[in-house]
């Protein structure tokens, strides 16, 4: 902006300060008298600096503006519009009602990891697919002896992993340290495709994995991975406890069976560039059989910003354990979403509560296993303890000591039917979810596209009866 012969320029309209420049380029700001109709505004308490002008002034501009006798340099033009010669006005973001210029340059958090392509072949997928990170299998196997209900064999989990690792690229007795540490959502859905209500869409996902993962052992790997998930539920080492969210795939580098994947772990998926010049931007997509619009199912309307969740649904029927995974959108936060999950998956909730203890080989309960509350309260000889003395062992040691035996009885773990984690949100009043069939190699697979997903993974929330 050329100043010409002007010695000052007004920034804003109805401002409390005016910026002056001299021949040396020095800048000073002076107050102006209040325009007619605008009251004085006291800043702070007591006597001090008094400003005049509109409630919203552009006092932040000195940090963005560098003035010389001939020009004004604006460091960040995002959100600035020129309304007339010599006048600069800030364009207000009507959606966020914010003056933050940085909102036009959203921050991104990218993550990268090297993995074997046993459970995730990035060449067969498109950017935007959710990727799941797997913990080391020894963590699950090590926790199975303590979590397995009495009467069930914790070694079944070790045997299921051994059978699966025989089909791994690295083999069962690998000592290189490389392992399949990432899992694609399509592979996870394909391994349990028989459990989804939309059979045609689920079979299309399985056909896509079999056709495009380019490994003759892919079908066996899918079957054994599904059996491994069943063994995790049977031993109460639930899959969600050993899986975390990696992010939305954007690019990869692959050589033989080793791949380096880059994903968006925080921020808007469309804000990151892919390594495909034909499609430089990507949106999140999920298999259609694994997508769930909770608000639509509950008939709550669609015009609202939505959260995005990843849900694991379990069935604890012995030897017929079930595992399903969904990506769901809903206006509910993490607390209210649990009630929606309980309503939508009431069959799994009831079945897990009834059959979660099947096969338990626990000892018979002692005749006096129940707390004799009525006898204790009616007996005058039993010691009492006032509430103010509950932290005093001298008083509590004399009370009736009751240690119940919960082996073989229903508990929170045996009644667990689901777990969910918030992946992020779609910050739009009218979020767009589009279902269409996409071509993956020689296979057509129905998918659902989610636009403007902002990744912000949280913690797992477990649901029990």
UniProtKB/Swiss-Prot annotation:
One of its GO terms (biological process) is viral capsid assembly. GO terms for molecular function: DNA binding. GO terms for cellular component: host cell nucleus; viral capsid. Signal peptide: none annotated. InterPro entries: Herpes_1. It comes from the Viruses. It is found in: Virion; Host nucleus. Its main location: virion. Pfam families: Herpes_VP19C. Keywords: Capsid protein, Host nucleus, Virion. Interacts with TRX2, MCP and capsid vertex component 2/CVC2. Belongs to the herpesviridae TRX1 protein family. Structural component of the T=16 icosahedral capsid. The capsid is composed of pentamers and hexamers of major capsid protein/MCP, which are linked together by heterotrimers called triplexes. These triplexes are formed by a single molecule of triplex protein 1/TRX1 and two copies of triplex protein 2/TRX2. Additionally, TRX1 is required for efficient transport of TRX2 to the nucleus, which is the site of capsid assembly. This is Triplex capsid protein 1. The gene is TRX1.
């Amino acid at each position: 902006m050329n100043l010409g012969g002007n010695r000052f320029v007004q920034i804003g309209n109805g401002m409390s300060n005016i910026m002056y420049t001299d021949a040396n380029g020095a800048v000073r700001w002076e107050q102006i008298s209040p325009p007619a109709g605008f009251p004085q505004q006291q800043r702070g308490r007591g006597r001090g600096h008094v400003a005049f002008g509109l409630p919203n002034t552009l006092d932040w501009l000195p940090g963005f503006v560098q003035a010389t006798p001939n020009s004004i340099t604006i460091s960040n033009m995002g959100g600035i519009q020129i309304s007339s010669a010599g006048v600069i006005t800030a364009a207000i973001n009507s959606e966020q009602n914010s003056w933050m210029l940085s909102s036009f340059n959203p921050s991104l958090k990218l993550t990268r990891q090297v993995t074997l392509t046993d459970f995730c072949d990035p060449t067969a997928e498109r950017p935007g697919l959710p990727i799941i990170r797997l913990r080391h299998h020894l963590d699950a196997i090590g926790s199975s002896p303590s979590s397995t209900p009495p009467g069930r064999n914790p070694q079944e989990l070790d045997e299921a992993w051994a059978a699966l690792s025989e089909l791994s690229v690295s083999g069962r007795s690998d000592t290189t340290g490389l392992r399949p540490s990432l899992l694609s959502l399509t592979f996870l859905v394909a391994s349990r495709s028989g459990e989804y209500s939309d059979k045609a869409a689920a079979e299309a996902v399985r056909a896509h994995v079999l056709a495009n993962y380019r490994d003759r052992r892919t079908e066996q790997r899918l079957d054994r991975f599904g059996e491994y998930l069943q063994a995790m539920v049977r031993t109460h080492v639930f899959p969600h406890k050993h899986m975390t969210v990696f992010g939305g795939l954007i690019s990869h580098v692959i050589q033989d069976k080793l791949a380096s994947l880059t994903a968006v772990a925080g921020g808007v998926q469309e804000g990151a560039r892919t390594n495909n010049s034909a499609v430089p931007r990507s949106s999140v997509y999920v298999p259609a059989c694994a997508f769930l619009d909770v608000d639509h199912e509950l008939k709550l309307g669609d015009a609202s910003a939505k959260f995005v969740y990843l849900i694991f649904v379990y069935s604890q029927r012995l030897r017929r354990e079930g595992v399903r995974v969904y990506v769901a959108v809903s206006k509910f936060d993490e607390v209210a979403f649990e009630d929606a999950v309980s309503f939508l998956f009431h069959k799994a909730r009831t079945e897990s509560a009834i059959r979660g203890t099947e096969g338990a080989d626990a000892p018979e309960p002692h005749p006096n296993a129940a707390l004799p509350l009525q006898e204790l309260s009616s007996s005058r000889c039993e010691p009492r303890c006032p509430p103010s003395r509950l932290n005093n062992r001298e008083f509590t040691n004399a009370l009736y000591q009751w240690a119940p035996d919960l082996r073989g009885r229903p508990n929170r773990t045996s009644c667990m039917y689901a777990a969910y984690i918030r992946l992020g949100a779609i910050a739009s009043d009218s979020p767009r979810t589009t279902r269409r069939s996409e071509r993956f190699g020689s296979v057509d697979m129905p998918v659902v596209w989610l636009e403007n997903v902002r990744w912000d993974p949280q913690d797992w929330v477990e649901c029990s009866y």
